[in-house]
Design a protein with these regions (language model features):
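Conduit-forming functional cores of very large proteins
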Residues: 1-307
Length: 307
């Protein structure tokens, strides 16, 4: 389903009665922790003059843009395009938490904002005027970067800044004075997107697929898969049934998954006595376990022609 694209592994699911019910997250998927909606309401009131419902007339309700926060109709705003773009800029510069979901339904004339926890989200490169964000001058000018810079922007932040704190800042409290004009040029190149936002975006898989309307591009096509699917060699050349079967069998070839397995209360655990490091492997083996956890065995097969 489109709402699960890039978030749930489309291959790694069991066959039989549990098909589609037992799911695995994709490689880059993250679960949000959530924060209170009150700071967002205060931001909309103070900076964007959002009207609460008890302050609005019938004409306002009919013509102004509705704002829903965590599913609650919280107010009405004018100039939704300006406010939407400003909120997205705040998200891409960590003034509001980077896991905040902001989507604008133009046809139905409402903006949805989600701050709650438990949402599945994933990172994507942004695209502007058919140019991917990884061509950003702020990125190219940096001699050293880290993941925090890629998702929160390149302006210098306080030492106590942490993206996991989910705090709402002002521009001056986070970056100091006279930094407002530098936000656009130094914003993040990667945005965390959930299903609600993805419904309003046009996401390309490859660089050649970018069109005028494209808003985002995948970091890498393999990130739509989970850990086990990315261990399969050339999954695009095999039937989907065999890929799903391979994911199920790979779990039984894992070596010592935990040193205290005798004391755990797992429902099931399969341990291979003599595991080996695969001779043929994908790049993800290096990233997942640094090739320090063997799994499976390398069979030796002799083939002879007999007539």
């Amino acid at each position: 389903h489109g709402s699960q694209w890039g978030i749930i592994d489309p291959v790694d699911t069991p066959d039989g009665g549990n098909i589609g019910l037992h799911k695995h997250m994709a490689m880059s998927c993250e679960i949000t922790t959530g924060y209170s909606m009150i700071p967002i309401i205060e931001l909309l009131r103070d900076s964007f003059n959002m009207k609460l419902l008890d302050e609005s007339s019938i004409q306002d309700i009919k013509f102004l843009t509705k704002v829903f926060i965590n599913g609650t109709w919280s107010g009405l705003i004018e100039q939704p395009n300006v406010i939407y773009n400003k909120l997205k800029l705040y998200k891409m510069t960590a003034i509001i938490p980077i896991y905040t979901s902001i989507s604008w339904n133009i046809r139905k004339n409402f903006i949805e904002i989600y701050t709650d926890g438990g949402r599945l989200t994933r990172p994507l490169f942004t695209v502007s005027n058919k140019i991917p964000s990884y061509n950003s001058k702020a990125l190219l000018d940096k001699s050293k970067i880290n993941w925090e810079d890629l998702v929160t922007g390149f302006l210098t932040k306080p030492d106590n800044f942490n993206i996991r704190n989910n705090l709402v800042y002002t521009i001056s409290s986070l970056y100091g004075k006279n930094k407002k004009d530098q936000l656009i040029d130094n914003k993040a190149i990667i945005e965390y997107v959930d299903s609600s936002e993805a419904n309003t975006y046009m996401i390309s898989t490859y660089l050649d697929d970018i069109k005028k309307q494209t808003t985002h591009i995948e970091i890498h096509p393999s990130l739509i898969f989970g850990i086990l699917t990315n261990q399969i060699m050339f999954p695009e050349n095999q039937p989907a049934v065999r890929n799903a079967y391979g994911c199920g069998q790979a779990k039984q070839g894992v070596s010592l998954y935990n040193s205290n397995f005798n004391n755990r209360i797992d429902k099931m655990g399969v341990i291979l006595n003599y595991p080996q490091i695969p001779i043929v492997k994908s790049r993800y083996v290096k990233y997942i376990t640094n090739e320090e956890q063997a799994n499976g065995e390398n069979p030796i097969v002799a083939i002879m022609c007999h007539t």
